[in-house]
Structures are given as structure tokens and as C-alpha cells.
Design a protein with these regions (language model features):
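Conserved "HGTGT" condensation-loop signature of ketosynthase/thiolase-family condensing enzymes
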Residues: 1-240
Length: 240
């Protein structure tokens, strides 16, 4: 067991990608990197952690991650020679629309019918009012950036009075720029006031896994979830 975060820090959400690349390198080179700065365990259960690099023959490794909003994940990395052969059985899945939610110009419509509208002067105020209209009380909602609030609120209406088993539902989210508007705001603060001014209140609840994670927690969804960044929305391509 080891941690790589101490080598390069948080990196605003890119650490999981960097760590995965390093894990692949470790597998290929049969070396387990030490946990930088490790001195003693901080947990009661015994775990094998070392500060020094070790040469260990490896076939597989498990990369785990814990993201903001309670979104946790794990992937298994395997050397090509030890990979299981994929099943050739393919199942046909019919995709059809059961409900739609549209949010535009301070108006929220469901299946083409307006269910909430507001005279709010800006989107930030409108989306808060739209969420309050659902009767929701998740205080984490107010920490999210506006794009996360948009996705979270839309699902509140979309899944209202829907019954399903946790494993029956997955999530596929798409937008054109991830959390770019908040990322720009975060960078402007650093440019104007320096690195010390960077604040979690600006960037913590912005990443795509936040909106996906909070939706899963709220609705007890245990299926797979994915966030795709595409310039143009193509429903047919996503279904494929």
C-alpha cells in the first residue's frame, strides 16, 4: 500500500490521472514507490507502508481514489500478458426517453411543460430558487458552483417519484467546458492576489465528480457514472 499524493499535491483534480500513469510505470518496471515522508501509521489496523522504493514482481495493482462529494472509485491495472480475455457475448440495449428536463431563461420545464419559473435577475439566484422549490435541504448544494447546481437540480426534478433499485441506474453527464467558468475565477484570484489566496470555497465543489457524486448520494445510485466533455451534444453518439 502506498500514497503518491505527497509527491505532487492535489493538482486541482488531476492527481488521479497522474497517479494512474505512475502506477502503470510501476507495473512495467516492477517497482513500488515509497510513500514520501512516511514515518508511522495513523490507523489502528496494521498496514504495510514504506517510505523507500521496493523492487517487487507485480502483475496487477488496484488504484483507488476518493473524490470531493463522496465520489469514490477504484480501477484494476493489469499487465497485458495477464489480462483476462473479454467476453464476446454482446447484448442489445434499447434506449428510449422516459422524461426530459430543460432549464433555460429562468424557466424549468419537464416533458415540455413549465413546472417552475422565476423573475430572478441572474442564473445563480434562479437555480437556488429552483432547488428550494423541490423542498431539498442538502447544505452541500450551496457550496457547489453553478454548473454543479444545474445538474443536481435537474436530477431532483427528473427523478421525482421515480422508483428504482440502486444498481439499476447509471449516470452519464455531458457539458462543453467542465467547470471552466469557476476555474477561470480561481486563476484570476491567484493572478491578482497570489497563490496564498487560493481558496477551497472557490474550487472544491466544482469538479465533474462532485455533481455526479452528490447525485449518487442523494438518490442512492450505485451504477456506473461518467462525465464527458464535448463541444457539441450528440445524443446518438452517447447512446452508442
Amino acid at each position: 500500500v502506498h500514497s503518491l499524493k505527497s509527491y505532487f499535491g492535489h493538482t486541482l483534480g488531476a492527481s488521479g490521472v497522474i497517479e494512474s500513469i505512475i502506477c502503470i510505470h510501476e507495473l512495467k518496471e516492477n517497482v513500488l514507490f515509497g510513500t514520501l515522508g512516511y514515518e508511522k501509521p495513523g490507523v489502528s489496523m496494521p498496514i504495510l507502508v514504506q517510505a523507500d522504493h521496493q523492487e517487487i514482481p507485480m502483475k496487477h495493482c488496484i488504484k483507488t481514489a476518493s473524490g470531493f462529494g463522496g465520489c469514490n472509485a477504484a480501477i484494476v491495472l493489469t499487465l497485458p500478458a495477464y489480462q483476462k480475455q473479454p467476453s464476446r457475448v454482446q447484448s442489445s440495449v434499447t434506449v428510449h426517453t422516459t422524461a426530459t428536463v430543460s432549464i433555460e431563461n429562468s424557466c424549468l420545464s419537464m416533458n415540455g411543460e413549465t413546472v417552475f419559473s422565476s423573475s430572478a435577475p441572474n442564473f445563480a439566484q434562479f437555480i437556488r430558487e429552483a432547488y428550494k422549490n423541490t423542498g431539498g435541504s442538502n447544505m452541500k448544494f450551496y457550496k457547489m458552483d453553478d454548473l454543479c447546481k444545474l445538474g443536481y437540480t435537474a436530477v431532483e426534478y427528473l427523478l421525482k417519484e421515480k422508483n428504482f433499485q440502486p444498481e439499476e441506474v447509471g449516470i452519464l453527464l455531458v457539458n462543453a467546458a467542465a467547470s471552466l467558468n469557476t476555474d477561470i475565477r480561481h486563476q484570476m484570484i491567484i493572478n491578482q492576489e497570489g497563490d496564498h489566496a487560493a481558496s477551497p470555497t472557490v474550487f472544491v465543489y466544482t469538479l465533474p465528480n462532485v455533481v455526479a457524486g452528490e447525485i449518487c448520494i442523494r438518490h442512492k445510485i450505485q451504477g456506473e457514472n461518467t462525465f464527458i466533455i464535448e463541444k457539441e451534444f450528440d445524443a446518438d453518439k452517447l447512446e452508442e
